[in-house]
Amino acid sequence: MPMIEVTTTEIVDREAAIAIKKALGGNISIFPGKPESRVMVVIRGETPIFFGGEEGPAALISVALFGEQPDETYDKYARVAVEAIVKALPTIDKSRIYVKYQTLTHKAWGKDFA
């Protein structure tokens, strides 16, 4: 299950959260074998972030994926993710959005332990 976490300094209302979820979750299929039906998206707003030592509107997008992915998919997804944040939260400049990826070697679903 891909896990996407968005942390931002801004207030995220329901409309913005849904737009971000649709864009980031809906485009997870950029990564082979990663359908939207298997993605979890967490969005946190109003979190202090210091980017380059400066406080101000910013966002961190963390994407955790099981297994290595083709190199070109990381940049392609980052472009989609940055565009989605700028569109949903226009107070954030794209130069203040950081996208990080984590490759997972193990996975566990709650249902696996029932």
Feature-to-residue mapping (PLM):
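Interaction-mediating elements
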Residues: 1-114
